[in-house]
């Protein structure tokens, strides 16, 4: 039941992000083995262009952000102390893509430099063997929608375990960012 709730919440979050991507640039990929089996990746990594990298253990759920012990690190090149780290961020990004595509780093970096990130990844992943496939948002049934929308298994804190479900909501704290999906 917990994985159903978290998977449903992820689907809602992805759809909310896509709805606010007017240029169609948001991409989420899932790695697959040579035989086509999905690879479970527990790591949480966010790379924004050559400007920011975040690596850590926290998840985008209330339990992780408020109740569990998590450790994240972020390098933001907009901060003076991190100036000049853009090439390092790009190398990490390209190395991760190369690993999941089972290709040499140099080839991945060259194709992305020539074609751009999205076009480069789309070109490089069109091959047999290990690859990246776009994350597809699953269709949610009524139970999954209820789990996602009401945080039944992911209250914001211990005090909310007994709060009426009608007062809960996946994006309640993020309304200023996303609004209701």
Explain the meaning of each model-derived region.
Residues 1-181:
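PLD/PLD-like phosphodiesterase catalytic module centered on the HKD motif
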């Amino acid at each position: 039941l917990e994985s159903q709730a978290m998977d449903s919440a992820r689907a809602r979050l992805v759809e909310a992000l896509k709805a606010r991507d007017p240029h169609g640039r948001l991409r989420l990929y899932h790695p697959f083995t040579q035989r086509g089996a999905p690879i479970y990746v527990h790591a949480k990594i966010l790379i924004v262009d050559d400007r920011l990298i975040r690596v850590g253990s926290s998840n985008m759920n209330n339990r992780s952000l408020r109740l569990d012990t998590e450790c994240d690190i972020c390098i933001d090149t907009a901060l003076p102390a991190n100036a000049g780290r853009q090439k390092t961020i790009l190398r990490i990004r390209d190395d991760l893509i190369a690993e999941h595509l089972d290709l040499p780093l140099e080839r991945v970096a060259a194709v992305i430099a020539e074609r751009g990130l999205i076009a480069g990844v789309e070109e490089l992943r069109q091959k047999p063997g290990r690859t990246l496939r776009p994350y597809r948002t699953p269709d949610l049934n009524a139970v999954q929608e209820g789990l996602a929308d009401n945080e039944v298994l992911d209250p914001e804190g211990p005090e909310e375990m007994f709060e009426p479900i009608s007062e809960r909501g996946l994006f309640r704290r993020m309304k200023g960012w996303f609004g209701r999906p």
